[in-house]
Structures are given as structure tokens and as C-alpha cells.
């Protein structure tokens, strides 16, 4: 097993490459920069988010739509597939408003990783519903198998919500992507969208942010699965 801190993926000219030197599929998003102009950034923060959707192709298509007014640098699917939508030294539109450690305009100094996941679910008449009120059938066909029931610190009253779990394959690939980014740009801090936006829930309780952060930043030894 790969030692934490050693990235098997790599970054060349701010584009992501696999360990066999093949480039990750790149679909440039029009939703980047500012006022129609590209903006170069020096990233020092990594932001973890979910797509609120069920597949990678849908997320990439959405980020390719100018009407979306949203994007991320890279998307990681449930089967470990990866697509890049913006070079890592370009300002993507993934963070929105909010501040972190007294700094605003987080898009201008961070890299955003989106993971394919439906995100927050609400139970209505015994059925899990997505934020669009669509019935959640479960990634494995049975929502009882892959939904974590837990509160979220941004939800008043501690209401219990549903959170589709991330696959181990997906988590392993996100780990590789994040380690490559950290190695290239010297990033020392990884947070969730939820950490600086009280109206956001991603990546949510199903994502093992604490152990993921430790592993990516080289603060945790050993292998095994990610602790939730």
C-alpha cells in the first residue's frame, strides 16, 4: 500500500495526470475567472464538496453550462473516475461567499474537489428525498444499505438527516488526487464547504474529513479504510 504523503498521481502545468503519465480527461469549464477573464491563483487551501448528483458525467455537463455559474477544479466519481474542469492555478467558482480565517473570496486562493454524491436527504413519509424532492433509490438499489443517518452541525435543532455514503474506491481516488495537489502546491489545510458556509452541508457526515485530512497531509501512518 502506498505510504501517506506519496502521491501516485501528478500535476504537470497545473493539469492532473495518472500514475502512468496519461492525462486525466479535461473538460474546460466556462465558469471561471472574473468578469469574463481568466484569473491566475496561488492556492493555499483545499475545499471538499459533493455534486448533489448521481454521476460524474452529469456534474461535468453542469459545470460546462454557463447558466450553472458554478464549477470545480476536479470531479471524482463513485467508481474512481476523474475529470478535471479547470487548471489548478485558475480561479474556479466552487466556494461562493463566506470567509475562512478572516480571508474572503475563497475562490481566489483555493482548489475545489467535487465528489459525486447526492448529499443531504430528507425523509418524507418513510422515503428518502433529495434536495430536489426526487426519491432517492440508493446507489446500490437499496437506500437502507448506503445511507448514514446523522445530524449536521449546520442544521438547527439537530434534526436527523440522510447522507449517502462514499465508496471506498471513490475515497481512495480522492486521496490520490488530494495528495498530488498538496505535494504540488504545498497546501497545509483541507476543509469542507460546510466549514465556512452555514447554508451548505457538503461534504457531509458521511465523508471522513478528519481522517482524510490527516492521511492526505501525512499526519497519519498506516493503511486500511477511512474512519467515519
Indicate where each model-derived feature is located.
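Conserved, surface-exposed functional patches that form binding/active-site neighborhoods
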Residues: 105-110, 124-127
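Hydrophobic "anchor" residues on beta-strands that sit immediately upstream
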Residues: 45, 110, 189
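Basic/polar, cationic surfaces and motifs that engage anionic cell-wall
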Residues: 2-20, 39-40, 116-228
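N-terminal catalytic cores of peptidoglycan-degrading enzymes
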Residues: 1-107
Amino acid at each position: 500500500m502506498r505510504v501517506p504523503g506519496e502521491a501516485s498521481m501528478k500535476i504537470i502545468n497545473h493539469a492532473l495526470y495518472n500514475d502512468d503519465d496519461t492525462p486525466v480527461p479535461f473538460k474546460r469549464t466556462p465558469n471561471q475567472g472574473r468578469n469574463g477573464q481568466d484569473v491566475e491563483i496561488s492556492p493555499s487551501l483545499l475545499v471538499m464538496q459533493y455534486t448533489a448528483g448521481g454521476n460524474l458525467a452529469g456534474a461535468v455537463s453542469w459545470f460546462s453550462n454557463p447558466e450553472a455559474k458554478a464549477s470545480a477544479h476536479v470531479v471524482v466519481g463513485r467508481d474512481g473516475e476523474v475529470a478535471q474542469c479547470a487548471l489548478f492555478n485558475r480561479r474556479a467558482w466552487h466556494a461562493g461567499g463566506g470567509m475562512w480565517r478572516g480571508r474572503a473570496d475563497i475562490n481566489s486562493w483555493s482548489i475545489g474537489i467535487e465528489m459525486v454524491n447526492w448529499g443531504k436527504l430528507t425523509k418524507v413519509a418513510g422515503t428518502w428525498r433529495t434536495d430536489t424532492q426526487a426519491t432517492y433509490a440508493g446507489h446500490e438499489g437499496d437506500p437502507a444499505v448506503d445511507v448514514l443517518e446523522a445530524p449536521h452541525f449546520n442544521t438547527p435543532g439537530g434534526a436527523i438527516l440522510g447522507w449517502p455514503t462514499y465508496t471506498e474506491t471513490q475515497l481512495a481516488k480522492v486521496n490520490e488526487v488530494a495528495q498530488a495537489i498538496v505535494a504540488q502546491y504545498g497546501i497545509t489545510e483541507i476543509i469542507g464547504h460546510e466549514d465556512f458556509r452555514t447554508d451548505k452541508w457538503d461534504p457531509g457526515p458521511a465523508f471522513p474529513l478528519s481522517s482524510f485530512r490527516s492521511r492526505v497531509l501525512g499526519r497519519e501512518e498506516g493503511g486500511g479504510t477511512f474512519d467515519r
